[in-house]
Design a protein with these regions (language model features):
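Repeated scaffold domains used in trafficking and secretory/extracellular systems
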Residues: 80-87, 129-137
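Acidic, small-residue rich beta-repeat scaffolds with periodic aromatic anchors
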Residues: 21-45, 49-53, 148-294
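Charge-biased low-complexity segments
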Residues: 287-394
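Bacterial N-terminal signal peptides
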Residues: 7-18
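Acidic, glycine-anchored loop motifs typical of Ca2+
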Residues: 88-99, 137-147, 154, 379
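Short, solvent-exposed loop/turn segments at conserved positions within beta-propeller repeat blades
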Residues: 56-59, 105-110, 161-168
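Active-site acidic/histidine clusters and adjacent loop/turn architecture
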Residues: 61-90, 95-108
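Surface-exposed loop/turn elements that mediate protein-protein interactions on large endomembrane-trafficking
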Residues: 62-77, 113-128, 172-182
Length: 394
């Protein structure tokens, strides 16, 4: 059995400050703003909340795992702390908890740590260098992937800030008996969508001008204003070219990556940038890998159980985000929804239920960020359907 105590949000959901739809990752504790506690059937309890200074809460987060009279501090005194998984089976009989931490609001990257939830928890794996981490049973086939990006490798690449890059190279990882495997090539459809989206934004005239440049696009101290404007426009094309190359390279298609580089990069600079791309990747998450996932030729979906068949999923994080540009209060009417929550505790689908006939986009965007302790059947984490109602507050 898993018992849960959640502060700030249960089924009546607090309306949090507006966040852009492009920002799809939320964290449980930000500057000590919320608390969560849950216990697993093995007797291990997770607690996340504001760090205490004497009797007062601080604007920092702390997370612990405790069992019996013992306690293990996962992190303390940090601005960001998230519980990404709790009770999730990465392999049969091996339930884990996973935490995402950041030591600074301004730092590029986060750290992801998985802990066993056996009677005496222990650290299993640490992954560093991602701008986010999110575990999901993406195909509902029972295999859990960890989605992240290689922010640490490309931050400052060619003088670029992460905020300038729309599509930071993505990794899809899998932990198999504690071996960290690259499963990105199994999700080429995702990378193809990135490539299609980036190519659609490329201006052919600017691409031609960029290919006629030196590729470095470095301004001199006495560059006139018009030249600076021109270089800035070419810089956008340069980023787009890198995004296409990265998408092919990180999805296991090196040949296509270099073909795209030849099509989109100045000929005289291709050897330099190719070597630099490979060096940057080598010092990122790639350096932490134990191999490449072989994958399955044919993926078979696992059953999605209804609530009477399982111990139901329970909420870790269920915040509601108002529509962008929302000025007045939202309708206070209760919204009934049916969710499919995968075996990693992430929402795979949301649709109206009961008296609710249509879902506004903000409900779907909000649901995509929710996290749950998954449902359990025979002590295994499984995908399930659940009905719930949300009531956005003014």
């Amino acid at each position: 059995m898993t018992s849960v105590r959640v502060a700030w949000f249960v089924l009546m959901l607090a309306l949090v400050p507006n966040i852009s739809a492009a920002q799809v990752h939320d964290v449980l504790c930000r500057a000590g703003n919320s608390s969560f506690e849950a216990s697993f059937r093995t007797g291990v309890t997770v607690s996340i909340g504001p760090q205490k200074d004497s009797e007062f809460s601080t604007r920092a987060c702390q997370g612990t795992l405790s069992w019996g009279k013992q306690k293990l501090v996962i992190a303390s005194g940090i601005p960001l702390l998230d519980l990404d998984m709790f009770g999730v089976d990465l392999s049969p009989g091996a339930p884990v908890a996973a935490f995402t931490t950041a030591k600074s609001n301004d730092a590029c990257c986060m750290t992801y740590q998985t802990y066993s939830l056996n009677e005496r928890p222990r650290l299993l794996r640490t992954i560093t260098g991602g701008g986010f981490f999110e575990a999901a049973d993406t195909d509902l086939d029972g295999d859990v992937e960890i989605w992240t990006d290689d922010s640490g490798a490309v931050d400052g690449f060619e003088g670029l800030a992460l905020g300038e890059i729309d599509s930071v190279p993505t990794y899809v990882l899998r932990l198999d008996h504690n071996r960290l495997l690259d499963a990105s090539s199994e999700f080429r459809g995702f990378f193809d969508d990135v490539i299609k989206r980036v190519r659609a934004r490329v201006n052919p005239d600017l691409l031609r001008d960029f290919k006629a440049s030196d590729g470095r696009l470095q301004a001199s101290p006495d560059s006139p204003a018009l030249e600076l404007i021109r270089l800035n426009k070419l810089r956008a094309v340069k980023i787009q070219a890198l995004e296409v190359v990265w998408a092919y390279l990180y999805s296991g298609r090196e040949k296509e990556a270099w073909q795209s580089l030849a099509e989109m990069w100045p000929a005289g600079d291709q050897e330099r940038i190719r070597e630099k791309i490979l060096k940057a990747r080598a010092r990122g998450i790639h350096a932490q890998l134990d191999g490449v996932s072989k994958g399955k030729l044919i993926k078979h979906r696992k059953p999605i159980f209804s609530q009477p068949e399982v111990k139901p999923a329970t909420a870790i994080l269920m915040r509601v985000y108002p529509p962008e540009g929302q000025e007045g209060p939202l309708d206070r009417k209760e919204i009934h929804i049916e969710l499919v929550v995968d075996s990693a505790g992430k929402v795979r689908s949301v649709k109206p239920a009961g008296d609710t006939k249509l879902l506004e986009q903000y409900v779907q965007v909000s649901a995509s960020r929710w996290k749950f302790i998954p449902a359990f059947k025979n002590d295994r984490s499984v995908a399930s359907r659940m009905h719930t109602a949300i009531s956005p507050l003014q």
